[in-house]
């Protein structure tokens, strides 16, 4: 048998910690081992894209572009790879062609060599702009075909999609098995067909989850696959990829030997084991719920997100119901593969169906957009009843979705204004307006607002930072400590024009073990209302879920409603950002808005009062 070295892409810096550690590894934790990783001889290092962009801005207070530059500066021999969601880029909706082109250009300039591009629906129209931009930048366009199991996803379907992508100029193909559903013998059939029909390298990306992936890799290797994805052992298994060390060992002495240095791999693993222990992060394990992926087909990473979402809603005990609801919703909307952003869209709809007790009563904007065709063509037929219920008489579009995107990069450049110091800042804002604006405000305030000695915490707004600075950080810290140690629930500090309120967080409401009423599992927050609201019989609109309250769809535009406005029943009042999606909240009565009871950008609890409306 002719020797054929198998290439290995290491996912440690991107998908591995996204899958197991909620994408919380910091750039500083990667730095000490980058040169060691560079010397291994990997086919590529996947280090950017996916959820890492959002997580840097939202949770780590880091600039994702700076992370890429830092990695590039320390990795000189190994190609750097990113995951790009086609027309979604690294976000959760479609962006205009000019934004896609500029994003690809800047990613290439900052260090990306290989762009793995996929579309959640395998709609090849959503590859076109990114593919052309990658080619123009002189970089490698790897087209990924998303694998799933459904009545409409056949072997011929995958070959047809792959053929269109090769015609588009793909330099290589990847089969993306995000849910670990690809069985060893089906992989053999699929890879054999791909190698027979297309003269481009084939890569296979599998998650471990239920444990099939190592066997699937071996059968795929025998069938001719060229490259596989793995992760260092502290970040392998469970929702992540198989361990690099295990796969390398399995191939030693075979015609497929990867020729990677095991001792160097173990040194890398020892370092990341230290990072894991310091971060308090878990190893990848396979639970019964994960093993049941072969039944419910919900990817492990999606299960982790669902668990997090339900904890936020104080309804973790409802997970089994949500897992039962997901396949039902998926079938109703045409069997989309459960990969970002469709995993969030379908999963969130299932959560809302279960927690509200009324199926399709609350529908996020993203689900509405999907049903309109704004993400692309559904793989299978969509339930006409669902379309009518959500869209009414509106018909789904038939053109390429990006052709209807109105916002341009220049529009966002004007919105963000002087907060943006470079095109990268404008792109971050275009993808995540609220999150990026908050980040840019924190980092462009200047050292005079650096009230905690290094950097203000991410949860402080610019106004709060200024107020704390004027009041004195040490005094604020002392007051916080005093409130925490006392029976006080709230203390107000006033000095001159500065007023700071320190308030204890209420304990989480208890959740009954038996599940209780479907619509009231999470205890509602019944905050005291003002006398004007109580005495005038105003209708109170409350938060139907835990989330972040926004009065407008973008920081630069007017609120949906203001005090004194007349609203109709069903009219949008605000947006609640929950479970990574934007959910429009409509008024359930017609009347006049008398009070807005929550601050813009504030975290709100289930049942918290948001608006007081005088019924018409």
Regions found by a protein language model. Name each.
Residues 36-56, 287-290, 297, 301-475:
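Terminal or standalone catalytic/regulatory effector modules within metabolic enzymes
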Residues 49-161, 173, 183:
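Active-site beta->alpha loop and helix N-cap motifs at the rims of alpha/beta catalytic domains
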Residues 1-23, 75-92, 135-149, 192-199, ...:
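N-terminal small/glycine-rich loop or linker at the start of catalytic domains
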Residues 178-360:
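Catalytic alpha/beta core domains of metabolic enzymes, predominantly
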Residues 445-542:
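Acidic, compositionally biased tether/linker regions
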Residues 518-616:
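Structured functional modules or segments
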Residues 11-14, 18, 50-52, 83-89, ...:
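Active-site beta-loop-alpha junctions enriched in small/polar residues
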